[in-house]
Design a protein with these regions (language model features):
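Active-site beta-strand-loop-beta-strand hairpin of nuclease catalytic cores
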Residues: 27-36
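Nucleic-acid nuclease catalytic cores
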Residues: 35, 40-48, 59-89
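Donor-sugar nucleotide-binding helix/loop cap in glycosyltransferases
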Residues: 94-280
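Single conserved hydrophobic/aromatic residue that forms the stacking wall/gate
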Residues: 2-12
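Short glycine-rich loop/turn motifs
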Residues: 21-26
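Short, positively charged
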Residues: 30, 82, 90, 98-104
Length: 280
């Protein structure tokens, strides 16, 4: 079909689109709405707008009812839903986030005191011969473990899945390796035996408890988690840097790595203290 698309400034140019690739993971219709769902099982900071826009535009032109594009991501027992709109249906750049929510199929009974008890019960292990993590999103570390449990992935495949640059793929794979959850096998990354047991826990609470144990087995994270859970707020940069004494890192490097420790501690707090997903 011939479509008008906006060029530079307010100039419109007419473009012919022939057999554009388009797929829909789910469609749900009511009397007033058609909801189009694009679903993923990997946590990326970005996505291709075309995946929502092409199906939206096709149905929006043919239906009188509202067409609602929704982006769905599933990871670690949580469904993340993002509802968008195109303020100008003729311009894919007019995409805007309307609302977002998280849902779970079961409630969580893992509270802050239970998590603190888990941390205190774990004896720290010797520091592994792996670079100290510099991967700020622990959610993405967990999600990567989910993906490689389904199928071993090469560095290039990890880069493509998350829209990373190659260096970021190394950071996240090595973060999972640092925790003893993943390992390189030839040209791919796979879960260790322990990592597979952790990620294949059928219950969300059991899986999160196992992840907290893996964190607490590393001395710096154990100290940061104990401080954070006891006070209900993430340990300070100074406290985290003090816990890093003995790692042989410069002060500047310690401060950069402290941001990863703080973000991972925040993940634990979010998991057990607040931000509880709504139940279906």
């Amino acid at each position: 079909d011939a479509q008008e698309s906006r060029g530079l400034g307010d100039v419109y140019k007419r473009q012919a689109v022939d057999r554009a690739q388009m797929e829909i993971d789910g469609g749900f219709e009511s009397l007033e709405h058609l909801v189009l769902v694009e679903a993923k099982n990997h946590l990326s900071e970005d996505f291709n707008i075309r995946q929502l826009y092409f199906p939206y535009r096709r149905f929006q032109q043919r239906l009188a009812k509202d067409v609602v594009p929704v982006y769905l991501v599933y990871s670690n027992g949580i469904f993340h839903l993002y509802r968008y709109e195109f303020r100008d249906p003729a311009d894919f750049r007019s995409i805007s986030l309307v609302d977002s929510a998280r849902y779970a199929l079961s409630s969580s009974h893992l509270d802050a005191q239970a998590a603190l008890d888990i941390v205190r019960a774990v004896a720290p292990e010797p520091e592994p011969a792996v670079p100290f993590p510099q991967a700020n999103s622990f959610e993405r570390v967990v999600n990567l473990l989910e993906l490689i449990a389904l199928q071993p992935l090469s560095k290039a495949e990890i880069t493509q899945r998350y829209d990373f640059d190659p260096r970021q793929a190394d950071y996240y794979a090595n973060a999972a390796r640092y925790l003893g959850l993943a390992e390189p096998v030839e040209d791919t990354w796979e879960p260790t035996e322990h990592g597979r047991r952790v990620i294949e826990q059928p219950q969300r609470d059991a899986r999160n408890a196992a992840l907290i144990r893996a964190l607490a087995a590393r001395r710096v994270f154990r100290e940061a988690l104990e401080l954070s859970l006891a006070r209900g707020a993430v340990a300070s940069t100074a406290e985290i840097c003090a816990a890093m004494d003995g790692l042989g890192l410069s002060l500047a490097t310690s401060r950069r790595r402290a941001s990863t420790v703080a973000r991972w501690a925040q993940w634990v707090l979010d998991t057990v203290v607040e931000g509880t997903p709504r139940l279906f």
